């Protein structure tokens, strides 16, 4: 699957390997940034100039992870990033990790007005898992270039992530690329399970 816009989620069923792309149906808001803005975020002062109400869920009946460009969430699960780089060394879930649940956050949804004056950005209010969020990072000094996050103990290898789900099952994941099979950067598609 490829993401042509920022308004889609790719749902992954880790049991079957099936992926399904669905339009985001969460509540949305557009922010117009200017010095006279009444609210403030990391980009500056803004006013909310448009909203869209949340619609009924369109997620598949069975899914484990969902990706929105580089954002990742679980299906009511918890995640964490380890400093381990060898996926084969993890045989069961460790007990000494800090599990992180999904949280509601404003995720970038519409960037068509980013280069206009005044700047207008669209956001969706959806879930993200901060324990899994750092599987990649923005490369400093670039405009929108991302790279895999590497382990602190071995900067040449990606860390292993752990995810436990509400049914008691779990996944041990190591992201190995930001590119899909065609070499295009846009989604998570190369996962070692």
State what each model feature region is.
Residues 1-193:
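Surface-exposed, beta-sheet-biased, low-hydrophobicity segments with strongly acidic/polar composition
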């Amino acid at each position: 699957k490829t993401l042509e816009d920022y308004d889609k989620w790719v749902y992954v069923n880790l049991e079957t390997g099936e992926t399904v792309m669905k339009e985001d149906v969460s509540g949305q808001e557009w922010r117009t940034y200017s010095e006279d803005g009444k609210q403030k975020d990391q980009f500056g002062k803004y006013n909310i100039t448009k909203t869209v109400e949340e619609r009924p869920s369109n997620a598949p009946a069975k899914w484990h992870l969902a990706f929105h460009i580089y954002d990742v969430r679980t299906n009511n699960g918890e995640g964490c990033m380890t400093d381990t780089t060898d996926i084969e060394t993890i045989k069961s879930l460790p007990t000494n990790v800090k599990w992180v649940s999904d949280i509601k956050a404003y995720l970038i949804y519409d960037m068509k007005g980013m280069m206009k004056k005044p700047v207008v950005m669209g956001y969706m209010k959806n879930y993200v898992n901060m324990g899994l969020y750092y599987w990649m990072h923005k490369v400093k000094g670039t405009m929108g270039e991302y790279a895999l996050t590497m382990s602190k103990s071995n900067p040449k290898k990606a860390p292993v992530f752990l995810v436990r789900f509400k049914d008691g099952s779990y996944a041990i994941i190591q992201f190995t690329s930001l590119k899909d099979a065609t070499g295009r950067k846009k989604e998570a598609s190369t996962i070692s399970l």
